[in-house]
Regions:
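Short alpha-helix boundary/capping motifs
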Residues: 43, 47, 68-70, 85-87, ...
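Extreme N-terminal segment that seeds HTH/winged-HTH DNA-binding domains in transcriptional regulators
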Residues: 1-33, 83-116
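Short Asp/Glu-rich motifs
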Residues: 41-42, 77-78, 115-116
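N-terminal helix-turn-helix
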Residues: 33-64
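Conserved beta-strand edge residues that scaffold enzyme active sites
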Residues: 71-72, 110
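Short, flexible active-site-adjacent loop segments at beta-strand->alpha-helix junctions, enriched
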Residues: 9, 70, 78
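A surface-exposed regulatory interaction patch that couples sensing to output
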Residues: 75-83
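Beta-hairpin "wing" of winged helix-turn-helix
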Residues: 27-32, 57-69, 75-76
């Protein structure tokens, strides 16, 4: 996998996003092995703690699994983020209906929140 780091966004978030996108579009298959923290940090010229933070967040989200010395792999539950997003959207829709907000206004609120 090719990694790109750009100014303007935190590096750990860029790494996290790139892994999620690669899992979603199939560039990273289930059980694909990711580079070691130190190896990826050296490759990108960044601090190992930055890679470790991205990996921790991805593991919390269920996208990857770390198996000690065996390494870090794409989880069989790599689509967990999509499921979490669907659950969040459903909860939001329920709350919006309870408040009597129109669908158009609800979409505008979400778009504004995503831009913030």
């Amino acid at each position: 996998m090719e990694w790109t780091i750009q100014a303007g966004t935190s590096v750990f978030e860029q790494l996290r996003t790139q892994v999620i996108e690669a899992v979603r579009d199939g560039r990273l298959a289930t059980w694909a092995k990711l580079p070691t923290v130190r190896g990826l940090a050296d490759e990108l010229g960044i601090a190992p703690n930055t890679v470790a933070k991205a990996y921790r967040l991805l593991e919390t989200d269920g996208v990857i699994e770390t198996r000690g010395r065996a390494g870090t792999f794409v989880s069989a539950h790599g689509d967990a983020i999509d499921r979490q997003a669907q659950l969040a959207a459903a909860a939001y829709a329920d709350r919006i209906r309870d408040l009597g907000v129109s669908p158009e206004d609800a979409v505008a609120l979400v778009e504004a929140a995503l831009r913030a």
